């Protein structure tokens, strides 16, 4: 039976450390500031933005939310990004995804100054990530690596299989796992013989947003299973992994909720602090 990878506990420990780092920055006369641009009324986006704001306030990080109407023009969004890029008090900047259809998400993200790109989504920072020369990492991917480190799960030489190829989780996590000398495969909706491939994984990560799609017969005995999915089924939150049966086969497994989710917001705040330190020559 698998042991639990407790992301909630690690997130709490990290929060204590981050609070001290913010205090240290303020002793140097530096105040971290995160600006979030949210366009429209997507309910999930509003929940995520509020969660970030609560955490930022708790740590002493100033967060400013630019809540724009759903019919906002792309030109006006780009002008706002330009003004925030030019503001020396703004240490980090992000656009909450998804954006309304009249706005090209790629163009908007590309406009962000890479030095303030807290989500690590600009082409320049994605390139640095794959080169192993990055100064910022996507929060969820960084949180997963930290969770594995915390439980002393070595990636060297391991077969790591990631189900999901998003720019937010799957692809950046693959880059970070390669840095740790894992052999990495990325699977997706068009991958053939999915179960045959997942059964080869020493470390299996699922990040597709499909409730309980990973069944016990798709998992190798003794595998480490990381569930990034958050899905609501019959009023309850479940992951992409069929938790109870898979737990019987895994050596380690993340629960949902309480696994990867709590780490994402904490690591976003860590990236804010890292960018702030870098911009002021304190890294």
Curated annotation (Swiss-Prot):
The residues that hold NADP(+) are: 164-166, 189, 230
Q: What is its EC number?
A: 1.5.1.5, 3.5.4.9
This enzyme catalyses: (6R)-5,10-methylene-5,6,7,8-tetrahydrofolate + NADP(+) = (6R)-5,10-methenyltetrahydrofolate + NADPH; (6R)-5,10-methenyltetrahydrofolate + H2O = (6R)-10-formyltetrahydrofolate + H(+)
Q: Which GO terms describe its biological process?
A: L-histidine biosynthetic process; methionine biosynthetic process; purine nucleotide biosynthetic process; tetrahydrofolate interconversion
A GO cellular component annotation here is: cytosol
- Identify one Pfam family in the record: THF_DHG_CYH_C
Q: SUPFAM superfamilies from the xrefs?
A: Aminoacid dehydrogenase-like, N-terminal domain (SSF53223), NAD(P)-binding Rossmann-fold domains (SSF51735)
Print the keywords alphabetically.
Amino-acid biosynthesis, Histidine biosynthesis, Hydrolase, Methionine biosynthesis, Multifunctional enzyme, NADP, One-carbon metabolism, Oxidoreductase, Purine biosynthesis
Q: InterPro entries from the xrefs?
A: Aminoacid_DH-like_N_sf, NAD(P)-bd_dom_sf, THF_DH/CycHdrlase, THF_DH/CycHdrlase_cat_dom, THF_DH/CycHdrlase_CS, THF_DH/CycHdrlase_NAD-bd_dom
* A GO molecular-function descriptor: methylenetetrahydrofolate dehydrogenase (NADP+) activity
Pathway this chain belongs to = One-carbon metabolism; tetrahydrofolate interconversion
Range of residues in the leader sequence: none
What's this protein's family per the entry?
Belongs to the tetrahydrofolate dehydrogenase/cyclohydrolase family.
User: What is the recorded function of this protein according to its Swiss-Prot or TrEMBL entry?
Assistant: Catalyzes the oxidation of 5,10-methylenetetrahydrofolate to 5,10-methenyltetrahydrofolate and then the hydrolysis of 5,10-methenyltetrahydrofolate to 10-formyltetrahydrofolate.
HAMAP family tied to this protein: THF_DHG_CYH
* Subunit structure, as described in the record: Homodimer.
Protein known as? Bifunctional protein FolD
Q: What is the lineage of its organism?
A: Bacteria, Bacillati, Bacillota, Bacilli, Lactobacillales
């Amino acid at each position: 039976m698998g042991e639990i990878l407790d992301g909630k506990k690690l997130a709490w420990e990290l929060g204590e450390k981050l609070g001290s780092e913010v205090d240290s920055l303020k002793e140097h006369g530096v105040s971290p500031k995160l600006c979030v641009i949210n366009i429209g009324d997507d309910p999930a986006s509003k929940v995520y933005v509020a969660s970030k704001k609560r955490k930022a306030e708790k740590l002493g990080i100033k967060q400013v939310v630019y809540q724009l109407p759903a019919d906002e023009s792309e030109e006006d969004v780009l002008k706002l990004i330009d003004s925030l890029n030019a503001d020396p008090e703004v240490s980090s900047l992000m656009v909450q995804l998804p954006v309304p259809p009249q706005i090209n998400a790629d163009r908007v993200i590309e406009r962000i100054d890479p030095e303030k790109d807290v989500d690590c989504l600009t082409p320049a920072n994605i390139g640095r990530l794959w080169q192993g020369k990055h100064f910022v990492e996507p929060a969820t991917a960084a949180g997963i690596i930290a969770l594995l480190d915390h439980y002393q799960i070595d990636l060297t030489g391991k077969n790591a299989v990631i189900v999901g190829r998003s720019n937010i989780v799957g692809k950046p996590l693959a880059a970070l796992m390669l840095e740790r000398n894992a052999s990495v495969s990325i699977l997706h909706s068009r991958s053939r013989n999915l179960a045959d491939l997942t059964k080869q994984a020493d470390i299996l990560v699922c990040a597709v947003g499909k409730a309980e799609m990973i069944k016990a017969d798709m998992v190798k005995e003794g595998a480490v299973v990381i569930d990034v999915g958050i899905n609501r089924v019959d009023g309850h939150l479940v992951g992409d992994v069929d938790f109870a049966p898979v737990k019987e086969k895994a050596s380690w497994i993340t629960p949902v909720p309480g696994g990867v989710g709590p780490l994402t917001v904490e690591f976003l705040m860590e990236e804010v602090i890292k960018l702030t330190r870098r911009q002021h020559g304190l890294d």
